C-alpha cells in the first residue's frame, strides 16, 4: 500500500492524502458473504443517544470475516484482495478446494494466487493459522484468540502484530503492540504475519467532511456548552468545568477502567504507563 497526496487546489485538499489501493484486485464483495448493516446513529431501542459522535456516513454492507480459521487440512487459494469499509485492514477472499469461500484479514506479503491453510500441520508463512503451541518462538502473529475456539480478538487492526516470545506449560507469552506481555492458552489459534495496510495510520483526512462520510460526528467539549446541556457547561468566561470529567448524563468519563480484573492474573509485564502532565 502507498499513500497518494493531493495538490492544494482547495482548503480541504491542502495536506490531505488517500490510500492508492494498488493492492485491491476487485471492487465489489462476494455476494454470499455480505450481510446488511443497519445504522443505529449511536441510539438505543428507545431512541436515546448512548454513544456520542456517531451518525450519518455512507451506507455500508458487512463482510463476514472468518476469525476462527477452523477449516483444517483444506488448502485455499487467495482469489482476491478487497477493500472493507468496516475495518482498517484489507481482506482476502479465499476459495477452498472443496468449493467453500471465506474472508480473512489480509496480512503483509499475501498476494492474489497464494495458497493458505490452517491447522496443526500448516507451514509457518503469512496467512496460515495454527495453534500457538505449534508456532516457533519469535514468530510475529496476528488475529489471536483469547479462548480456544472463541475467534480472534487481538491484533486485528491494520499494521498491528504480536510477537510470540516464550512458551511455559499451558501458556504462551505474547508481546502486545503496547509492550505488555500476556499469557494466552497455547491451544488458541493465531495467524502468521502482520496485518497489512500499515500505512493507513499516516493518512491525513484533510477536512471534517471526510470524517462525516465515515459516520463520525463532531466532538463538542462540555465546557463549551450551556448548563442545560452538560454538567461542565456555563460559568462566566472560560472555566475548567470545576469537577472530574463526566458525560452529559453526569457519569464519570475517561480513565474509568476497573483497577482489578480477573484477566489481570494473565499479565506477565504491564505496558509502560504515560505519566499524566
Curated annotation (Swiss-Prot):
Covalent S-S links between cysteines: none
Region named Disordered: 35-57, 222-277
Classification via Gene3D superfamilies: 2.30.30.30, Nucleic acid-binding proteins, Ribosomal protein L2, domain 3
SUPFAM superfamilies linked: Nucleic acid-binding proteins, Translation proteins SH3-like domain
The keyword Protein biosynthesis belongs to this UniProt entry's keyword annotation: no
Key words of the record: Ribonucleoprotein, Ribosomal protein, RNA-binding, rRNA-binding
Keyword Electron transport (UniProt): no
GO-annotated molecular function: rRNA binding; structural constituent of ribosome; transferase activity
Annotated function: One of the primary rRNA binding proteins. Required for association of the 30S and 50S subunits to form the 70S ribosome, for tRNA binding and peptide bond formation. It has been suggested to have peptidyltransferase activity; this is somewhat controversial. Makes several contacts with the 16S rRNA in the 70S ribosome.
Subunit structure: Part of the 50S ribosomal subunit. Forms a bridge to the 30S subunit in the 70S ribosome.
Protein name as annotated: Large ribosomal subunit protein uL2
Amino acid at each position: 500500500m502507498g499513500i497518494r497526496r493531493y495538490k492544494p487546489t482547495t482548503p480541504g485538499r491542502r495536506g490531505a492524502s488517500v490510500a492508492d489501493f494498488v493492492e485491491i484486485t476487485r471492487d465489489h464483495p462476494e455476494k454470499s458473504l455480505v450481510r446488511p448493516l443497519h445504522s443505529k446513529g449511536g441510539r438505543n431501542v428507545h431512541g436515546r443517544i448512548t454513544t456520542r459522535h456517531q451518525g450519518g456516513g455512507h451506507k455500508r454492507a458487512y463482510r463476514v470475516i472468518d476469525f476462527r480459521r477452523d477449516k483444517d487440512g483444506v488448502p485455499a487459494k487467495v482469489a482476491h484482495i478487497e477493500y472493507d469499509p468496516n475495518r482498517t485492514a484489507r481482506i482476502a477472499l479465499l476459495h477452498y478446494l472443496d468449493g467453500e469461500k471465506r474472508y480473512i484479514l489480509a496480512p503483509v506479503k499475501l498476494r492474489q494466487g497464494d495458497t493458505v491453510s490452517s491447522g496443526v500441520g500448516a507451514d509457518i508463512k503469512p496467512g496460515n493459522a495454527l495453534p500457538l503451541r505449534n508456532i516457533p518462538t519469535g514468530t510475529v502473529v496476528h488475529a489471536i484468540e483469547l479462548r480456544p475456539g472463541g475467534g480472534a480478538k487481538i491484533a486485528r487492526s491494520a499494521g498491528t502484530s504480536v510477537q510470540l516470545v516464550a512458551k511455559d506449560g499451558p501458556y504462551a507469552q505474547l508481546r502486545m503492540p503496547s509492550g505488555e506481555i500476556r499469557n494466552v492458552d497455547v491451544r488458541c489459534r493465531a495467524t502468521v504475519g502482520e496485518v497489512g495496510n500499515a500505512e493507513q495510520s499516516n493518512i491525513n483526512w484533510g477536512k471534517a467532511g471526510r470524517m462525516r462520510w465515515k459516520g463520525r460526528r463532531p466532538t463538542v467539549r462540555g465546557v463549551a456548552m450551556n448548563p442545560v446541556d452538560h454538567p461542565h457547561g456555563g460559568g462566566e468566561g472560560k472555566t475548567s468545568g470545576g469537577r472530574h470529567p463526566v458525560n452529559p448524563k453526569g457519569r464519570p468519563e475517561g480513565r474509568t477502567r476497573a483497577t482489578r480484573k480477573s484477566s489481570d492474573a494473565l499479565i506477565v509485564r504491564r505496558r509502560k504507563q504515560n505519566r499524566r502532565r
